[in-house]
Structure formats: C-alpha cells, structure tokens
Amino acid sequence: MYKEKDFDIIVVGAGHAGCEAALATAKMGLQTALFTIYLETIAQLSCNPAIGGLAKGHLVREIDALGGIMAKVTDMAGIQFRMLNRSKGPAVWSLRAQADRILYNIYMRKILESTENLAIKQAMVEEIVVENGKVKGIITSLGVFYGAKAVIITPGTFLNGLIHIGLDSFEAGRAGEFPSKKLSESIKKLGLKMGRLKTGTPPRIDAKTIDFSKTEEQGGDDPPIPFSYSTKKINNPQVPCYITYTNEKTHEIILNNLDRSPLYSGKIKGIGPRYCPSIEDKVVKFRDKSRHQIFLEPEGLSRKEYYANGIPTSLPYDVQVAFVRTIPGLEDAEIMRPGYAIEYDFVYPTQIRHTLEVKGIEGLYLAGQINGTSGYEEAAAQGLMAGINAALKIKKQPPLILGRDEAYIGVLIDDLVTKGTQEPYRMFTSRAEFRLLLRHDNADLRLRDYGYKIGLVDEETYEEFNKKKELLQREIKRLKTTTIKPSEELNKALIEAQTTPVEEATFLDKLLKRPELNYDFIKKFAPSEVTLTKELEELVEIHIKYEGYIAKQMELVERMKQFEEKLIPENFDFNIPGLSREVIQKLTEVAPRTIGQAMRIPGVTPAAISILMVAVQKKTTVKK
C-alpha cells in the first residue's frame, strides 16, 4: 500500500452533496480532498435539468444564506426561472429554475478548482479505514492510502448501483459510469445497517423530432428572480418548456407490457420514490385518469435534448419508443437516451447524529442519497451541514444544528435521524410545522448570521445583509408609526380597490393589512424616503400582513422549546420500567438527544414521554 499525503477532511463523491461539503470545509480553512470516480461528471444533474421547486427551492435559498454554492451556480446556469404557488400564501412560494446541464457542471468545477485548501482527485475509493472507533482515512482501488481526521461519504446512487431497462440489467452508478461496490462492502463491515432504494429517469428526446405546435408553451418569470441573494442579474437567455399529455393509447401500451417491466416482474427489490412514481406506476395506480401531464424541459442552450418530465420508466426500449410516439407532439420522436431505473444501497439514517456523523464512529459523516433522501437540493443541504460540522469538530467548536423552527434543513435532518425512512425521502412544505416562519423570502434573515459566524459568509456579503436588515426594520417601523389622513383621492382609490374608505387618520400598517391592498398602494400615497428593492418591498408586505399569524407560530415555538432544551444524557439507558419493549427498542435505536426529539419518534406515546421525563430528571438530579 502506498501512503499519500494526509488531509484534514476527505470528501468521497463529487455530486451535489460532495461539492457543498468540500467547498464548506475548504472555505473554513481545512485542507480538503474531494474524490470522484470521473472528473467530467462533477455536480452532474443526473436526472432532471432543474433546481428547486416546492420546498426544494427553500432548501436552495437556505444553502445560499449559510454560504453554500448551489444557488449561485444555478443562477449562472439558469435558463428559466419560475416562482411556484404565487396564487397561495407566501409560506409555500417556491422558486424553480431550469438549468443548463453543461453550464452547471462547468461553473461548479471552475469554482472547485479555484478554491484554496481544496484538492480534487479522480480515484475509486474502496475502503474507509477506522481504528478504535475513529476514522483514519481511505484507501483507493490503486491501493493508495490517504489519511484524514474526518471522512464525508456522499456516493449518490453509486453504492452497488444496478440499472434496469426492461428485463435487462447491468451494474452502474449512473448510465455509462462504474458503480462503487467495495465501498458499500466497507460500510457494511463497519456494522451499519443498510437497505436498498430505487429511483428512475425518463427518456430524453431529440428536439428536431418534436412537433412543438402540438404542445403548450410555458415560459418563465420576466424578469427572472435569482436563487442567490448575491446575484444581481440573470445573464443567460431564457427559454420555454412545453407541456403535453399521455392518453389512453399510451396507457394501453404500458399496461400490455407490464410483464416486461422490472418493476412489476419482481426484478426490482428496492423501494421507489412515492412522490416521483414511474409512468408504469401512475397508469396502474390511477386507472381512472385518462391522461398524465408531461413537461418537455430543455437540457441546455447548446443541446437539442429534451427531458420528458413525467414519464420516468424502466420499460424495455421498444416499449418506450412505442408509448412515447402516442403522445401529442412526439409522434415522430427519436429517443436519444432511454429511461431507466436504478437500485442502490443506502444507510438507515437513524444511525447518524444531527451533525450527520455516524454514531459510534468518530469522524465519519454521511450525506445525500446514502441517508435515504432523493433530490439534488436535499443532498446539497446535507453535504453543506456535514462539511460544516466536520470542520467545526476538528476546530473544537460547537456543532451547528438547525432547529425545525429555523430552517427546512433542520426539518430534513431531524426527520431523517429521528423518524428514519424506508423510501426515498423528499422535502415538502407540509413536513414543516412552522412553515410561515420558514419562508423562501426570509432565509437570509434566519440563517445569514450562522454563515458569517462559521466563516462561510464574507465581510462584504454580511455588510450588505445588515444594510438590508436595517432598511427592512426601518420601513416596518415607519409603517407602524406613520398615519395617513382621509382625502378624496385616497378614499376614491380605496373604493376602486373594493375596500372601505377611511374616516380618520389611519396607521399605514393597518391599511396594508387589508387583503385588497398591497405595498404599491401604500407607496403611492405615502412613499418611503429610501428606495427599496422589489424584494424588500415584498418582505415588508409579508411581515405586516402576516404579523398576527407569525406571532402565533413564535408562541408555539417558545412553548416547544422547553422540550427541545430538556437534554437527555449521553449513553442514557432507555431500559426504563413502565416502557413497552417496542418503545425501549425505538428510543435505544434513535438515542434522542432531547425530550423534544423523543416526542417525534413514531410510536413513542405521550405516556412513554412522561415516564422518560421522570427517568431523565432522576438521572440528572443524581449527577448533581
């Protein structure tokens, strides 16, 4: 075995989790090595060429607020931006961007290669070296040992990856790339319980063979709203997507060929994503639906490939061709790449801590699909937090654990380590109890201070943020302390807006709280002395309009804090008289760090929590 130089931190896998982890640790001043099987596929958009979407957009904004990179690269590579759910309340507004697959890879690699303290290595990592419960480094397929104080594993779908197209299957981590088999064996040897998951991707269509006149064009927002708080302008040309639908003929072909589907023949054992089902699943489970929506998404400005979002499939190639050509606009479609399903190994995430460090193995961190999640954004968020916490531990500083009331990232990680998952986990706004506090628009107000404190947000960015915060507070104060007197012009405008006129001097915030009025109306009659950006105006309006609801959620957060702050001692014995065997087993497996976390474990009843609280109180009293 050949011994190479040591690093502070080694990151294995250069997907979305790995890139965030490596950049975070390097920016925090630690010597970092990022290992990838193939340099050309760094930050590959393996499935759809898009970032964000419902709740996922929140994660990207939070990554940006903490000092991560995904939002900035998306803005550099974005070719269409849309704010989703505008017709609903601001808590569920989410930004989504179509990204140029080639540009995304180019910009991310350029950033990685220009980052100090970061070395990038093309090598197959096969073994994690652990001695006396502490990570020591990794060994590559060439027998090279690299030492490290911490190792972050972010392998995506590569652990024992197996691709299925019809009844044919072959080993791969992604189409055309080697799987990682020995690394999976190494993880199992460490005693970690592993399972099998599955995901899928649709066929890609040659644009020259699509009749777009038979589809519905869907453009983006104009002007486009960037993901990153630092981005001033989107520079790429913006292009549309196109909508079409399956039909009964499509469904008939699929149903007639289920015997050739690896999903329905029993060949695939892994559990697939509930919220991103294959077209086979949709047709079988929703037989009452005569059609399913398809979004034709451009893969990039320099590519003639379209991603057929809505028809992920693992049916044989000939069946894919047959059913695709029944779809309006795709009658003459040529498939450039067939759809496929991929099975891969994952680690049951109740075996990791909130820091994403593996319980019982000091210095080993897991992030991304290995923890049972699906999606680029969920992976990137975990990668960032694993990197931050690995760096903080080496620096002998307290960990950064985000609460469920602070960030969707906090909800994501707490769900994984507390509840675990048996299927690919996807983030939704409905998973957050405090979603009115965790809005897309206020991610920087929630998290920027953390990013600055740990060293991921630079002075200039932080200064700009503080100026924005000051302007926001000043304008809210002005609206709360300034009155407007009745006038003929004002009351005429109020009547036109279908709201009641004012008869006496009224505070501006009271007017703005009216559902019929917006900030533009207030600005017309009582403009601010300082010009606010559109983003700030929106933030002011949301704060004023939802002030009462926000206050109620804050009260609930404060009530819950008593449980979140009630710590359970390390290595606590949950074998408590009065608890059922099932509850003891669940508490022992998860090893919650607080009473609040214990309350969220499925199957742990309120009665069990009462018994646990008494036992914890006794233990802490005895210690004192």
Swiss-Prot record:
Its cofactor is FAD. GO terms for cellular component: cytosol. GO terms for biological process: tRNA methylation; tRNA wobble uridine modification. SMART domains: GIDA_assoc_3. SUPFAM superfamilies: FAD/NAD(P)-binding domain (SSF51905). It is found in: Cytoplasm. Keywords: Cytoplasm, FAD, Flavoprotein, NAD, tRNA processing. NAD(+) binds at residues 272-286. One of its GO terms (molecular function) is flavin adenine dinucleotide binding. Gene3D superfamilies: FAD/NAD(P)-binding domain, GidA associated domain, C-terminal subdomain, tRNA uridine 5-carboxymethylaminomethyl modification enzyme MnmG/GidA. Its main location: cytoplasm. InterPro entries: FAD/NAD-bd_sf, GIDA_C_N, MnmG, MnmG-rel, MnmG-rel_CS, MnmG_C, MnmG_C_subdom, MnmG_C_subdom_sf. It holds the Pfam family GIDA. FAD binds at residues 13-18, 125, 180, 369. NCBIfam families: mnmG_gidA. HAMAP family: MnmG_GidA. Belongs to the MnmG family. Homodimer. Heterotetramer of two MnmE and two MnmG subunits. NAD-binding protein involved in the addition of a carboxymethylaminomethyl (cmnm) group at the wobble position (U34) of certain tRNAs, forming tRNA-cmnm(5)s(2)U34. This is tRNA uridine 5-carboxymethylaminomethyl modification enzyme MnmG. The lineage of its organism: Bacteria, Pseudomonadati, Nitrospirota, Thermodesulfovibrionia, Thermodesulfovibrionales. The gene is mnmG.
